[in-house]
């Protein structure tokens, strides 16, 4: 059976949420971020402003640029609403970020109903959040991802098969292929490889020898629409966690606690959403030196008490010796159980 894979991507997610909160910002160039741009509105992108750019550089490109602070609590709340909506359709979902994910629809819809499903899906997202998303449907994750980028924003595109996929992308610049970033694109340009069709000139062994096994195989397979990656949904939950890498490292304890609070809220929401309990907690911290440390604690009983878990994790994070600025922070609940063993024991003895 041919797979039906969908990729959705919320349009300028953070910026669009801020416009929803303040409609006067509509059609104005704005970015969300403090020192670094995390999201730019489509009006700001007309000035070549993009994510990961310094806010100071963005202001040089657009002196009238509106800069708003990041409100992760609100963004995560809305992201959770979207996740809950999708999980009512199927559990075969891989959420790759707060604003995008892959959905395996193979067992959900008939092939002839792809377009109708996409239109209904986009409508449901709009009704729920007043936000728009771009959607792609393909025969694997690669084709779905590329399809979702074709008619952004608020568009959709469907690849029915490999032949259609190859025909569509052959004349596109090679950077359309996932994994071809700015640096690799420059390397390929120096080798006179500008377009997807240029890759077809070379056999697999040449590409592997020239660019390494991972890059070479990715180029060879991707231009042909070959991708065997599965949508990585969790069949059995053993742990629930989230981590974040910071473009600007966290410099002091107040910044660390601020980000910890945000990660804890998001991770705890996932614990509740999955209707499970935890009996161990873990904090992961990576410094700018790339030294990585984890600290864990086994709890005396399984629980999903928010206050209890927060206090235990707060103690744990404060036990770290701050060697350097923090580049990555992670929060995890482990030893997941479907029931509260302490409560079951109490009920049994009543």
UniProtKB/Swiss-Prot annotation:
Active-site positions on this chain: 100
GO cellular component: cytoplasm
SUPFAM superfamilies named among the record's database cross-references: DNA/RNA polymerases, Lesion bypass DNA polymerase (Y-family), little finger domain
Compartment annotation: Cytoplasm
Cofactor note: Binds 2 magnesium ions per subunit.
Cofactors (names): Mg(2+)
One MF annotation (Gene Ontology) recorded for this entry: magnesium ion binding
InterPro entries per the UniProt record, alphabetical: DNA/RNA_pol_sf, DNA_pol_Y-fam_lit_finger_sf, DNA_pol_Y-fam_little_finger, DNA_polymerase-Y, DNApol_IV, Rev_trsase/Diguanyl_cyclase, UmuC
Domain UmuC: 5-181
Residues binding Mg(2+), per UniProt: 9, 99
CDD domains named in the record: PolY_Pol_IV_kappa
The keyword Kinase is assigned to this record: no
Domain of life: Bacteria
EC code: 2.7.7.7
Keywords of the record: Cytoplasm, DNA damage, DNA repair, DNA replication, DNA-binding, DNA-directed DNA polymerase, Magnesium, Metal-binding, Mutator protein, Nucleotidyltransferase, Transferase
One GO term (biological process): DNA-templated DNA replication
Catalyses which reaction(s): DNA(n) + a 2'-deoxyribonucleoside 5'-triphosphate = DNA(n+1) + diphosphate
Subunit structure, interactors included: Monomer.
Function: Poorly processive, error-prone DNA polymerase involved in untargeted mutagenesis. Copies undamaged DNA at stalled replication forks, which arise in vivo from mismatched or misaligned primer ends. These misaligned primers can be extended by PolIV. Exhibits no 3'-5' exonuclease (proofreading) activity. May be involved in translesional synthesis, in conjunction with the beta clamp from PolIII.
HAMAP family, A to Z: DNApol_IV
Protein name, per record: DNA polymerase IV
């Amino acid at each position: 059976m041919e797979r039906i894979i969908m990729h959705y991507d919320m349009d300028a997610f953070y910026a669009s949420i801020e416009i929803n909160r303040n409609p006067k910002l509509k059609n104005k160039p704005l970015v969300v971020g403090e020192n670094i741009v995390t999201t730019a509105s489509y009006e700001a992108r007309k000035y070549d402003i993009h994510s990961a750019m310094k806010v100071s550089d963005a202001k040089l490109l657009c002196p009238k640029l509106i800069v708003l602070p990041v409100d992760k609590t609100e963004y995560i709340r809305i992201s959770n609403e979207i996740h809950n909506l999708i999980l009512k359709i199927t559990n075969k979902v891989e959420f790759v970020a707060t604003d995008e994910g892959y959905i395996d629809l193979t067992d959900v819809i008939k092939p002839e109903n792809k377009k109708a499903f996409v239109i209904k899906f986009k409508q449901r997202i709009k009704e729920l959040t007043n936000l728009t998303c771009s959607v792609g449907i393909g025969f694997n994750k690669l084709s779905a991802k590329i399809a979702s980028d074709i008619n952004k924003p608020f568009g959709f595109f469907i690849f029915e098969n490999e032949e259609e996929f190859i025909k569509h992308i052959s004349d596109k610049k090679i950077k359309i292929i996932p994994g071809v970033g700015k640096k690799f694109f420059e390397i390929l340009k120096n080798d006179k490889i500008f377009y997807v069709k240029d890759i077809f000139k070379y056999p697999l062994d040449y590409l592997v020898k020239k660019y390494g096994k991972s890059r070479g195989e990715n180029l060879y397979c991707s231009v042909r629409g070959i991708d065997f990656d599965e949508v990585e949904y969790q069949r059995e939950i053993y742990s629930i966690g989230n981590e974040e890498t910071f473009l600007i490292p966290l410099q002091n304890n107040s910044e660390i606690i601020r980000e910890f609070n945000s990660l804890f809220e998001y991770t705890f929401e996932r614990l509740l959403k999955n209707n499970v309990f935890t009996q161990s907690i873990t904090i992961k911290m990576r410094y700018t030196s790339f030294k990585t440390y984890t600290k864990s604690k086994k709890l005396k009983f399984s629980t999903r008490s928010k206050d209890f878990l927060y206090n235990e994790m707060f103690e744990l994070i404060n036990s770290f010796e701050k060697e350097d600025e923090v580049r990555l922070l992670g929060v995890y609940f482990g030893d997941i159980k479907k029931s509260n063993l302490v409560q079951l024991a109490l009920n049994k003895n009543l």
